Amino acid sequence: MGCTVSAEDKAAAERSKMIDKNLREDGEKAAREVKLLLLGAGESGKSTIVKQMKIIHEDGYSEEECRQYRAVVYSNTIQSIMAIVKAMGNLQIDFADPQRADDARQLFALSCAAEEQGMLPEDLSGVIRRLWADHGVQACFGRSREYQLNDSAAYYLNDLERIAQSDYIPTQQDVLRTRVKTTGIVETHFTFKDLHFKMFDVGGQRSERKKWIHCFEGVTAIIFCVALSAYDLVLAEDEEMNRMHESMKLFDSICNNKWFTDTSIILFLNKKDLFEEKITQSSLTICFPEYTGANKYDEAASYIQSKFEDLNKRKDTKEIYTHFTCATDTKNVQFVFDAVTDVIIKNNLKDCGLF
């Protein structure tokens, strides 16, 4: 009898060992699967981060894929110069050279067909080049916080000669700079540091936010993007609302949401390059009247960081991992994402009882 019990005990111990091994393997597998949700207000740089993941972790854009972005580059360039010229009327800025008024008429006459065909004809590129060189147009561009203008306007317009070539193929950087409003949810998969990432980019405009909710289940981490340079801008969809205030309101609702009690929150204070250019010209008091510091990058950026981190109501149990980013700078994003991944690995292993 004793031998029988001993054999049963041995078999039970083996089974228990096998169950433990399976549980551990399942735990390790779960720890390697990462669901990342990219959130943030419109035009905060979420889609650019997704494009960077393709460049960094998936060998970038092929020549054919780059070619497909040509029409978007043309459209962004045309839309940018049109926005500036339209704003000149509202801001009562005159062309330095009166002949540019004819070019402006030509711009509006030619642009519709060019955008529809995904082209930049020679006559239109000449019109755009002359307009962009005008001092009145440049003065209006300098006041771009007073109207809605694509962040990449100067990037494309300054490089018009290259873009207008008949054999033009967009570079990786050109692709990164393109702006297409995200509607719905864009899912990207990639592997990094033995982790299998599923990244979800959702539209930031108010009308798109109702689509977020079904993405929330089982989220490992949220990357919340904020455009630092938007502190003196209003929303495209609500011209009464400051963009930074809208971002803070949204971050508050995400950071303190009961569904995200155990979710890592990573804060990307993005567009640091544009913010550094702008802060010396446009005071932070536009957004934060109580701000008494200098209009210098380090001090102003730290102040914005503290405003966001102070929204966290569970500081004792929840940490916000903040990074200053420039989403169009591949090296910067690579460095930051490396640090983010280390945090995710540590937190995942902790959750699975393996750390």
UniProtKB/Swiss-Prot annotation:
Mg(2+) binds at S47, T182. A lipid is attached at C3 (S-palmitoyl cysteine). GO terms for molecular function: G-protein beta/gamma-subunit complex binding; GTP binding; GTPase activity; metal ion binding. It is found in: Cytoplasm; Cytoplasm, Cytoskeleton, Microtubule organizing center, Centrosome; Cell membrane; Membrane. GO terms for biological process: adenylate cyclase-activating G protein-coupled receptor signaling pathway; adenylate cyclase-inhibiting G protein-coupled receptor signaling pathway; cell division; cell population proliferation; G protein-coupled acetylcholine receptor signaling pathway; G protein-coupled adenosine receptor signaling pathway; gamma-aminobutyric acid signaling pathway; modulation of chemical synaptic transmission. Residues 32-355 form the G-alpha domain. A lipid is attached at G2 (N-myristoyl glycine). Residues 266-273 are annotated as: G4 motif. Residues 35-48 are annotated as: G1 motif. Pfam families: G-alpha. GO terms for cellular component: cell body; centrosome; ciliary basal body; cytoplasm; cytosol; dendrite; hippocampal mossy fiber to CA3 synapse; midbody. GTP binds at residues 40-47, 176-182, 201-205, 270-273, 327. It is a lipid-anchor. Residues 325-330 are annotated as: G5 motif. It comes from the Eukaryota. The keyword Nucleotide-binding applies. Residues 174-182 are annotated as: G2 motif. Residues 197-206 are annotated as: G3 motif. Keywords: Cell cycle, Cell division, Cell membrane, Cytoplasm, Cytoskeleton, GTP-binding, Lipoprotein, Magnesium, Membrane, Metal-binding, Myristate, Nucleotide-binding, Palmitate, Transducer. G proteins are composed of 3 units; alpha, beta and gamma. The alpha chain contains the guanine nucleotide binding site. In this context, interacts with GNB2. Interacts with UNC5B. Interacts with GPSM1. Interacts with RGS12 and RGS14. Interacts (inactive GDP-bound form) with NUCB1 (via GBA motif); the interaction leads to activation of GNAI3. Interacts (inactive GDP-bound form) with CCDC88C/DAPLE (via GBA motif). Interacts (inactive GDP-bound form) with CCDC8A/GIV (via GBA motif). Interacts with CXCR1 and CXCR2. Guanine nucleotide-binding proteins (G proteins) are involved as modulators or transducers in various transmembrane signaling systems. The G(i) proteins are involved in hormonal regulation of adenylate cyclase: they inhibit the cyclase in response to beta-adrenergic stimuli. May play a role in cell division. Belongs to the G-alpha family. G(i/o/t/z) subfamily. This is Guanine nucleotide-binding protein G(i) subunit alpha-2. The lineage of its organism: Eukaryota, Metazoa, Chordata, Craniata, Vertebrata. The gene is Gnai2.
